[in-house]
Amino acid sequence: MTPYSSFLFFILLGILLLPTIILGLNGKRFQAYNMFISIIILALIFSHDLHGVIALCLFTIWQVLLISGYLAYRQKANSGFVFCGAVIASILPLFLSKIWPFLSHPQPHHPPHNLISFLGISYLTFKGVQLIMEARDGLLKEQLPLHRLLYFILFFPTISSGPIDRYRRFVKDEQKAWTKEEYADLLYTGIHKIFIGFLYKFIIGYAINTYFIMNLPAITHNKILGNLLYMYGYSMYLFFDFAGYTMFAVGVSYIMGIKSPENFNKPFISKNIKDFWNRWHMSLSFWFRDYVFMRFVFWMTKKKWIKNRMAVSNIGYFLLFMLMGVWHGLAPQYIIYGLYHAVLMTCYNFFEKWNKKYKWLPSNRWTTILAIVITFHFVCFGFYIFSGKPFHHHH
């Protein structure tokens, strides 16, 4: 059962969350109950997928051993090699799940069963890597209580597609004793978000896909216009589908007393590509910014291998977006999508510097509108690449 994809899922979820809501509105602690229903809901999600359950359990044991082991090691020593080893070991299951389809030679009609992969592996990997990095930075000092670590890794509302939370932020919410009034606020916000999610995913997103994208052959026979309309349609569909999905995840988290981070902030009114990545899939881009880009820039500055700061940040962007592309998958569209955004970020970097120097583009209402329109088209073209449509040859 895929999370948030059927009304049955919401009905079961509603029934299971009732005790949480009653406890919360009476100002009582509900985290132990939440941990209990998390197990039930994970069992529901994976009910038809025994491979998935086994993979999830093995993956979780692997990550917990790695994190606990590295934390224990970090209290005594701090070698860069051990740190890199731990990070690589943490990413290994995800890496294997990505290359698995290429390793096993499938018959064209029977895709091989990916034994390593399971729903949510890409998002859970972020949690493991993040904990190891925070231990390295000395932000996590003592061993993490097992139940709390497991609850963080396996927190079901965000398991399949994020948003990506941070351990210390999560635990602060998890340990907090919400008052009746605070919980009533959380509950209201959560339900509100869930209804916006219904609007986005099941009404707007569904309508765009069913009545626009599916009907494109009937709307126009012109190939160029057809592709252009597909680009706009797909970009809108992607946003409403994914933002709706995120609304569900965040809404359910709020009802469970966890304020999961937001993922979208009006991405289509971004004034430039940097602004776009601060508004689109924010928990993902901030994760890459903090754990890949900043580390890389810091490391380069410390080692003084490349003196030019502009070059360092541009190489950092290529590293970040190539990783982000590969993280989505190894199909050509994802890798080209990553490259495309790296090039855009680099060009914008140069433009920004140049514009600061020569004041070529004045800042007023019209240039802002122009900037939004230009950014929007660059972004949509990126999604057009991402959709894989340019790579499908029609017979």
Swiss-Prot record:
The chain crosses the membrane at residues 7-26, 31-46, 51-76, 80-104, 121-137, 180-223, 225-256, 309-328, 334-351, 365-387. Pfam families: MBOAT (PF03062). It is an enzyme of class 2 (transferase). It is found in: Cell membrane. One of its GO terms (molecular function) is acyltransferase activity. Pathway: Cell wall biogenesis; lipoteichoic acid biosynthesis. GO terms for biological process: lipoteichoic acid biosynthetic process. Keywords: Acyltransferase, Cell membrane, Membrane, Transferase, Transmembrane, Transmembrane helix. It is a multi-pass membrane protein. O-acyltransferase that catalyzes D-alanylation of both teichoic acid and lipoteichoic acid (LTA). D-alanylation of LTA plays an important role in modulating the properties of the cell wall in Gram-positive bacteria, influencing the net charge of the cell wall. Catalyzes D-alanylation from DltC carrier protein. This is Teichoic acid D-alanyltransferase.
